[in-house]
């Protein structure tokens, strides 16, 4: 099959199963696997929307312990003997009684050849309805606070009627509002400068023993269950929408005076600690979201990231490199401990920042990364970017259920040929050992199961594997041999039931050494994203230059292994079609904001890396290598063009999509025409249409994206054009003179190497056989 045919096939599999593999044929020996350079890995999107797929209303049929694999199309079923043979452990299992009517022609949905992904609604109900605790910073300007209040009031109408809602506000103090008390506004106040442990939080809120705080403990009084106690702070939306709306509307700015040379006292750490403690006491392993809305950095109490003195700037990447960080390590330790507690309880923490300066996302990032929460970084809560992104969190499916899963976990099973080495994505390890766990570690390893807590239809995970057997194929069996993996995703659906989604993947094992099917099975797009995740994972612990060297080394080794060339002759270097884009993906990854921190704040770096680790192959590739489309009067519609400075032409409009930004760039001549107002004159309708077309395309891109990208319209020579110039391959720089690119293309002032220079060096090193 040619490359285009294979791409279509992989695309069909992605639509059906939500999975892309770096290699679609598995090497048959560990030796062969080590020569592949790029690890065997999968980008898996467990909740990928499949509107036409049935939801099975019965329990899955599973293999005996310890295997526990779920019945799937690859199982051998003996209809007459009513048994099935598990393809993972080869054990024989009886079919349950209700399968008595199956025949060769009438089989249940889970055995249908195309049912490689199937979803079950389990009988187990959720322990509680979905819970949302809003944690709101009151140290902000009135218009900003009003925007948050309006967004929260609007979100109440989007929640399921039985959802429980709580409210915590914080400034100099943290206040837990007792929504169940209707006589007047009543709240429990925590000092912003004090570090409370879980027991103290629960005692102060009267949750520890089910009695009200400051009440004598009457021996004859029965102890109320903790759920009843927490119900004072968490009320169902349908019952308390009026009270909650009232409470939100009455929220005022923090009254504590702030001097001109000081930052407001903001106890973000205490507020989050109280929120985690409140849910921990009564709702362990119940689906919940803690949503933080902060408009500045924590300046008081545990988790503070900068002092209240304005003369002291918040830490930069430069400070971190020089270890000039006063509060960083202590704050990181505090928030990481909170994140682990939240993840263990199955609770999600979402971080929404509305501030031009940094708010301390770098320190808080694992609250979202460990729990599958959202991170949203915006300049202000009054911006449409925040308002529209926040509402999209509550998107619903056709049955009016929220498109979010709670309290999720993922388990991976493999046949004996494969072992799982780890996962890179928003999850924590469940420390589950099995025969499927590999010896090496890539990402979060030494386990075959992870807890994700929050999961949505675009949550994607990089899962990495190794080959188990040492030699060639063991017992020679007739026909091609297969390696298999099964992904089991348990999650609490917003309808109130637990669901299980099962995806089973089988791929052929390669033949003897040098089998050409291995190279043909390489999916360069999935491989680039899997390697980008490893790069970002390394960048969190290693120095930037070391990570770039690793990216280069792996690329040179891959090209040495799979390119056609004569030794020491760079001009003879050729790559097969399914490898040709991989070097340029790596070129753009090296220059991207994921690995280059220059010009970004630590908070921005944390945000960008968070989003990369959440998206599927298609969206991740846009982040790594943005798309560029050109519009001109010479052709209809848009034309994809190279992400290159030579693509800038005076009579063209460019549309750049970096995932985080959507930018419309008017060439010099077009900008002059527009400023002269030609498009409003008779006879220039085609110019008006040309100016409108990229806006329509941009609107379409923005309409289906989360978080909402920043929309920029700029002209050649304008200051905003820097967003475009920083992404382009600098083929025409101040050093190339008149030789590189056309006369009319843009000169970029940079010392970065161009893609051509990068490729020349790559070929030279690859053919020399040294990495």
Curated annotation (Swiss-Prot):
Primary location class: cytoplasm
Highest taxon in the source lineage: Eukaryota
GO biological process, one term: intracellular protein transport
GO cellular component term, pick one: cytoplasm
Positions with a binding annotation for Zn(2+): 63, 67, 86, 89
Family: Belongs to the SEC23/SEC24 family. SEC23 subfamily.
Protein name: Protein transport protein sec23
Organism: Emericella nidulans (strain FGSC A4 / ATCC 38163 / CBS 112.46 / NRRL 194 / M139) (Aspergillus nidulans)
């Amino acid at each position: 099959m040619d490359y285009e045919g294979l791409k279509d096939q992989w695309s069909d599999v992605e639509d059906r199963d939500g999975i892309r593999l770096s290699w679609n044929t598995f090497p048959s020996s560990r030796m062969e696997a080590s020569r592949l350079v790029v690890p065997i890995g999968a980008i898996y999107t467990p909740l990928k929307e499949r509107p036409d797929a049935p939801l099975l209303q019965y329990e899955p049929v599973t293999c005996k312990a310890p295997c526990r694999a779920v019945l799937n199309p690859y199982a051998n079923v003996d209809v007459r003997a009513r048994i099935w043979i598990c393809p993972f452990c080869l054990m024989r299992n009886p079919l349950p009684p209700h399968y008595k009517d199956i025949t060769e022609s009438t089989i249940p949905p889970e055995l249908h050849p195309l049912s490689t992904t199937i979803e079950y609604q389990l009988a187990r109900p959720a322990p509680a309805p979905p819970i949302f605790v809003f944690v709101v910073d009151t140290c902000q300007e009135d218009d900003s606070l009003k925007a948050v209040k309006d967004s929260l009031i609007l979100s109440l109408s989007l929640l399921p009627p039985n959802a429980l809602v709580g409210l915590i506000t914080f400034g100099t103090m943290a206040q837990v509002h007792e929504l169940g008390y209707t006589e007047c506004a009543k709240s429990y106040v925590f000092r912003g400068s004090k570090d409370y442990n879980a027991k103290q939080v629960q005692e102060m809120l009267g949750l520890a023993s089910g009695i009200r705080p400051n009440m004598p403990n009457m021996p004859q009084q029965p102890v109320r269950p903790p759920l009843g106690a927490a119900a004072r702070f968490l009320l169902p939306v349908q019952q308390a929408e009026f009270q909650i709306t009232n409470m939100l509307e009455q929220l005022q700015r923090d009254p504590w005076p702030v001097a001109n040379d000081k930052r407001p006292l903001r106890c973000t750490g205490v507020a989050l600690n109280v929120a985690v403690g409140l849910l921990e006491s009564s709702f362990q392993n119940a689906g919940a979201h803690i949503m933080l809305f902060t408009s500045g950095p924590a300046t008081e109490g545990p988790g503070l990231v900068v002092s209240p003195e304005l003369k002291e700037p918040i830490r930069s990447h430069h400070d971190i490199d020089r270890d000039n960080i006063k509060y960083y390590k202590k704050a990181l330790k505090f928030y990481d401990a909170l994140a682990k507690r939240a993840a263990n309880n199955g609770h999600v923490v979402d971080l929404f920042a509305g501030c031009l300066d940094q708010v301390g996302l770098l320190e808080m990032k694992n609250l979202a990364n460990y729990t599958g929460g959202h991170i949203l970084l915006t300049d202000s809560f009054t911006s449409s970017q925040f308002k529209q992104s926040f509402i999209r969190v509550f998107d619903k499916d056709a049955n009016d259920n929220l498109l979010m899963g709670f309290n999720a976990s993922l388990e991976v099973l493999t046949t004996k040929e494969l072992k799982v080495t780890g996962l890179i994505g928003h999850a924590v390890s469940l420390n589950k050992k099995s025969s499927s766990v590999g010896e090496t570690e890539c990402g979060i390893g030494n386990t075959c199961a992870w807890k994700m807590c929050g999961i949505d239809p675009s949550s994607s995970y990089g899962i990495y594997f190794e080959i188990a057997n040492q030699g060639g194929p063991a017992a020679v069996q007739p026909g091609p041999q297969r390696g298999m993996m099964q992904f089991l995703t348990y999650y609490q659906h917003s309808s109130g039931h637990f669901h299980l989604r099962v995806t089973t993947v089988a791929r052929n094992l390669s033949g003897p050494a040098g089998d050409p099917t291995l190279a043909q099975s390489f999916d360069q797009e999935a491989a680039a994203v899997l390697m980008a995740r490893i790069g970002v994972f390394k960048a969190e612990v290693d120095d930037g230059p070391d990570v770039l060297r690793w990216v280069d080394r792996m690329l040179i080794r891959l090209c040495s292994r799979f390119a056609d060339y004569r030794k020491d002759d760079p001009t003879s270097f050729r790559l097969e079609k399914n490898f040709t884009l991989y070097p340029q993906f790596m070129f753009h990854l090296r220059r991207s904001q994921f690995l280059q921190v220059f010009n970004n704040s630590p908070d921005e770096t944390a945000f960008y890396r968070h989003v990369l680790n959440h998206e599927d192959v298609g969206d991740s590739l846009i982040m790594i290598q943005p798309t560029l489309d050109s519009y001109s009067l010479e052709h209809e519609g848009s034309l994809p063009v190279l992400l290159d400075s030579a693509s800038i032409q005076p009579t063209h409009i460019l549309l750049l999509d970096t995932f985080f930004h959507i930018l419309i760039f008017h060439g010099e001549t077009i900008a002059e025409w527009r400023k002269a107002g030609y498009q409003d004159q008779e006879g220039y309708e085609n110019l008006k249409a040309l100016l409108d077309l990229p806006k329509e395309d941009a609107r379409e891109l923005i309409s289906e994206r989360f978080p909402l990208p920043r929309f920029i319209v700029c002209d050649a020579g304008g200051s905003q054009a820097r967003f475009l110039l920083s992404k382009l391959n600098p083929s025409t720089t101040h050093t190339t003179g008149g030789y590189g690119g056309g006369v009319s293309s843009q000169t970029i002032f940079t010392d970065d190497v161009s893609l051509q220079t990068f490729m020349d060096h790559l070929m030279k090193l690859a053919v020399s056989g040294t990495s």
